[in-house]
Amino acid sequence: VCSSDLGVQMMVRSDISGSGVMFSIDTESGFDKTVLINAAWGLGENVVQGAVDPDEYQVYKPFLDKPKLTPILAKSLGAKEKKMIYARAGHGHGSPIRNVPTSKAEREAFVLSDAEILELARYAVTIETHYGQPMDMEWAKDGESGLLYIVQARPETVQSRIDTHALKSYRLKKAGVKLLEGLSVGEAIATGEVCLLHSAAEIERFVDGAILVTSTTDPDWVPIMKRASAIITDHGGRTSHAAIVSRELGLPAIVGTGNATHLLHDGQEVTVSCAEGDHGIVYEGIAEFEVEEVELHEVPPTKTRVMLNLANPAAAARWWRLPSDGVGLARMEFVINNGVRVHPLALTRYDQLTDEAAKAEIDRLTRGYARRTDYFVDTLAMGLSRIAATWYPNPTIVRMSDFKTNEYAELLGGRQFEPHEENPMIGWRGASRYYAEGYKAGFALECQAIRKLRDEMGFDNVIVMIPFCRSPDEADRVLEVMRENGLERGKGGMQVYVMCEIPSNVVLAEEFAKRFDGFSIGSNDLTQLTLGVDRDSGTLAGLF
């Protein structure tokens, strides 16, 4: 090369588009079949430093070579309240960059389209394959050409080094009042006193073993972070500086809480729990918890197929190392209650909704979606996909929603669409809702979510199960409604099970067997309905 040769490289104009960070492994559980992507508007420094709460996406790697599938496991809209851009000449006293507030439209929109999310994920897999190890990458989108670029790639240094033969789990035994929540980093629990700092220069005030609470962190904070037992920040995502350093130090952290520095105070005793899935929770007081460690290579093999019961999608990846034969029960209503949070009819009949507070919250939750019903379908499908992905291709049995009317009423907008029942336990629940005009439109959204999960995302290991089906005639009606919504038993390998939890399911077992591919025994309901004993009655507990 001649000494006068000059390399010319294009500047990626992410200042007029977006940028972020990407990992080819799940940063919290070490699950190696997912890609984690964070994204924000403008230059990437804000994401790296944790100065903004970015969008977050998760993608299932094994399906990325199938162009017809969209294996996006999770999409979370971040606040993205500011963006970093290039400063004009003479602005900012010589600084080449500056932060400006984002517009309302930017805050309410995802930075990346589904196609761009998948494109980045494919880049991650290619880079990981090239280097032969999990990778930590930074990316940027050029606002002029619309092209995506990888601007940095380095080895992931935490999860890839963890001993995969041991499984350590934390469980809260009793906790105080929930004070606030954010994104969890790690899976541990810590207790102690709060030390609230606004600047790394306050290092002399920090007490060893305290819980560090601050707005955000940068490299100047590392000496303090090393002395903390846990870390809580107002801002940042799972790929921010605070999250990365906490992970490397083995500390539980909760980032992106929004207002920890306003709600918590010096000397306050709190419990930091990252053991409950994606959302870390700060509880008041010193809670009791237990830690269990299992050497997986010492677990003996069994002749019987052993499957897990799971409800929380966010916690599914924590258990991926277990030698499970699949998921024996995934409760859809848990995903609706904790993920979707909205009554389906409050979305299909939004214009009829009279609760203005509920409408305002629904508007907030459905930001970024062209149709409100898409929010329900996508959120439900993605929540269930995180369970189905963990042990794919082993089966995942998903039970359709089994709320009672009083439980449906607690969903956003639900009270307007649910009748009052004296005994919801044996009232309008399970199969009887699915074909009734009072809920049929809601069940259609559930079916659309299952269809998306199987056909568009690729999780053909999902088996659907119908709860509380009282008669063969009711079974026929439910199967017909499912068929009308694109879920036909036997088509494309589609299997449908039924809960055996009513005496009629046992008495008419042969008739039910003609209509379904399998049974799952619901011992609680079957016992109480056979004996006529309320399972929640303390007085009759000895008879149950």
Indicate where each model-derived feature is located.
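Conserved phosphate/anionic-ligand binding catalytic regions in large, soluble enzymes, centered on
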Residues: 11-57, 135-160, 240-245, 315-336, ...
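Conserved alpha/beta-domain cores
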Residues: 15, 124, 294-544
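Short, small-residue-biased leader/transition segments that mark boundaries at the very start
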Residues: 2-3
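Conserved catalytic alpha/beta cores of large enzymes that bind or transform nucleotide phosphates
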Residues: 38-136, 141-142, 175, 180-191, ...
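Terminal amphipathic helices with adjacent charged low-complexity linkers/tails
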Residues: 61-63, 76-96, 129-172, 261-289, ...
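Acidic, glycine-rich flexible loop/linker segments
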Residues: 144-145, 151, 155-161, 165, ...
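Short beta-strand segments
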Residues: 9, 38, 273, 309, ...
